[in-house]
Amino acid sequence: MSTRQAVFERDVDEDRWPRSARGLAGVNTVFEGDSEINSKAMRLLEKTRHRRNLLNRREDRRRYLGGVKAKAIESDYYHRNQLPSSYDAGNDDFEPINNSHVESEEENKRLPEKYSLDKYVKRSRKQRDHRHIVAKPKEKRNFAPSKLAMYEIEKYQRSTALLIQKIPFAKLVKEVTEEFAGESQDLRWQSMAILALQEASEAYLVGLLEHTNLLALHAKRITIMKKDMQLARRIRGQFI
């Protein structure tokens, strides 16, 4: 009888062992004269039991406590795959190796929290209720003509962009040049030249309308009239 022969027979009835534990059926076998094999078998058995306990605790933690730091999960994985360096077969107070000092780059990251059934139901109900709600049309605010005019004046005074569209202004410039130059001369305009003309034209019109508005206010009116513009041009030295 060799030293690797088991003390008790291994022909154990397979019905006594569940399907998941049949692979470990021979782990409890003790061999005579070979302490190394016995220690390895006991380590494997303890590792399997410890892995099962850790897995249950980890699942419960993720299910009921929500997000868990990645460091704790990494520590659990480390315990599950770590064999103890020294194990005393007669010591029942076995504690796993503490690897809380293991640092990870993702220790500050948190796992996504698992949805509970109540939150999911409440969220789906809110989405369903919002579908049937008809959006109320925005009420139009009615401004007095004087207030609306002053609002538009202040709006355009704050802005610095060009008020006339570029393409219609360019067409007008080309029509005027063709009228004065004649059809014999084919004149072409650069975009920068047309832009400079537009800025100068808008500056002149804005200044003229500003003076016209001041004259209308001086006459205790809001609406500008033709005579206001004529007076403004005469004061500025531009005779009609």
UniProtKB/Swiss-Prot annotation:
Protein's GO biological process: 2-micrometer plasmid partitioning; kinetochore assembly; mitotic sister chromatid segregation; protein localization to CENP-A containing chromatin
Region ranges (Disordered): 83-109
PTM description: Ubiquitinated. Is degraded through ubiquitin-mediated proteolysis when not protected by its association to the kinetochore.
Function: Histone H3-like nucleosomal protein that is specifically found in centromeric nucleosomes. Replaces conventional H3 in the nucleosome core of centromeric chromatin that serves as an assembly site for the inner kinetochore. Required for recruitment and assembly of kinetochore proteins, mitotic progression and chromosome segregation. May serve as an epigenetic mark that propagates centromere identity through replication and cell division.
Transmembrane segments: none
Protein's UniProt keywords contain DNA-binding: yes
Assigned protein family: Belongs to the histone H3 family.
Pfam families tied to this protein: Histone
Keyword terms of this UniProt record: Centromere, Chromosome, DNA-binding, Nucleosome core, Nucleus, Ubl conjugation
Assembly: Component of centromeric nucleosomes, where DNA is wrapped around a histone octamer core. The octamer contains two molecules each of H2A, H2B, CSE4/CENPA and H4 assembled in one CSE4-H4 heterotetramer and two H2A-H2B heterodimers. Interacts with the inner kinetochore.
Gene Ontology molecular functions: centromeric DNA binding; protein heterodimerization activity; structural constituent of chromatin
GO cellular component terms attached to this protein's record: 2-micrometer circle DNA; CENP-A containing nucleosome; kinetochore; nucleus; peroxisome
Keyword Lipid metabolism: no
Localization per Swiss-Prot or TrEMBL: Nucleus; Chromosome, Centromere
Segments for region (H3-like): 127-238
InterPro entries: Histone-fold, Histone_H2A/H2B/H3, Histone_H3/CENP-A
UniProt name for this protein: Histone H3-like centromeric protein CSE4
